[in-house]
Regions:
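A generic fold-level signal
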Residues: 2-3, 14
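C-terminal scaffold of the Radical SAM
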Residues: 3-5, 26-47, 52-233
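Local cysteine-cluster metal-coordination motifs and their immediate loop/turn environment
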Residues: 13-26
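Short metal-coordination and nucleic-acid-contact micro-motifs, chiefly zinc-binding Cys/His arrays
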Residues: 8-11
Length: 234
């Protein structure tokens, strides 16, 4: 078969907490049949008979919400079922605070070579305001632990134009992101989606977002500051 894929995405729909802005396919992990899901996932992987992959991305949900044993099962089975002989990049999403030492050890012995962390903001009050479960100190602890384990291809996600967010807070977030000395940053403006806490609040007039001019100023600052530090916008 021609034009067979060389990239694959695998979805882990479980979360330890549901963020107020997220409309991705996800469920709260407590009392969910996680092991059954992982076994069914492996059956689907076998069904597709994928060719040698160049990139593999495991997202969610929150893949790091899995226990160390479940994560080990997932990654070990993927190595059995998929051809990694041409693999260049294997990314897994994680949340700061979720990546315990035993989970990092599981990642280290696997083929995974890139970690994408859902930081979103460094501001502790804002983290609570958007429904995140980690705090600023856990961001640094997680990245230090990953680097100590030999992971240097680390990316973080940041969201700007959050409810009540100021330009000064964006400046602070960018400065702290740059200080991490990591090779990749993903920054997104907040987009309100249906069936989220934030959209429900917006419909009731209870969500106060930065205006369009302020959001534009935030974007221009982020782009300029990151380019100054050698990052390429794409």
């Amino acid at each position: 078969m021609q034009n067979r894929p060389t990239s694959a995405y695998i979805h882990i729909p479980f979360c330890t907490q549901i963020c107020y802005y997220c409309d991705f396919s996800k469920v709260f992990i407590k009392n969910q049949p996680v092991d059954d899901y992982l076994k069914a996932l492996m059956e689907e992987v076998r069904h597709y008979e994928l060719p040698a992959l160049k990139t593999l991305y495991i997202g969610g949900g929150t893949p790091s919400a899995l226990s160390a044993e479940q994560l080990d099962y997932l990654l070990t089975q993927l190595e059995h079922e998929l051809d990694f002989s041409q693999l260049e990049e294997f990314t897994i999403e994680a949340n700061p605070g979720d990546l315990t030492a035993d989970k990092i050890a599981v990642l280290k012995k696997s083929a995974c070579n890139r970690i994408s962390l859902g930081v979103q903001t460094f501001d502790n009050k804002m983290l609570k305001r958007i429904g995140r479960s980690h705090n600023e100190s856990q961001i640094y602890e997680t990245i230090d632990s990953l680097k100590a384990a030999g992971f240097h291809n680390i990316s973080i996600d940041l969201i700007y134009a959050l409810p009540g967010q100021t330009m000064d807070q964006v400046v602070d977030n960018v400065a702290k992101a740059l200080a991490l000395d990591i090779p990749h940053l993903s920054l997104y403006s907040l987009i309100l989606e249906n069936h989220t806490v934030f959209m429900n609040r917006q419909k009731r007039g209870r969500l106060h977002l930065p205006g369009e001019d302020v959001e534009s100023e935030m974007f221009d600052y982020i782009l300029s500051e990151l380019e100054k530090h050698g990052f390429e916008h794409y």
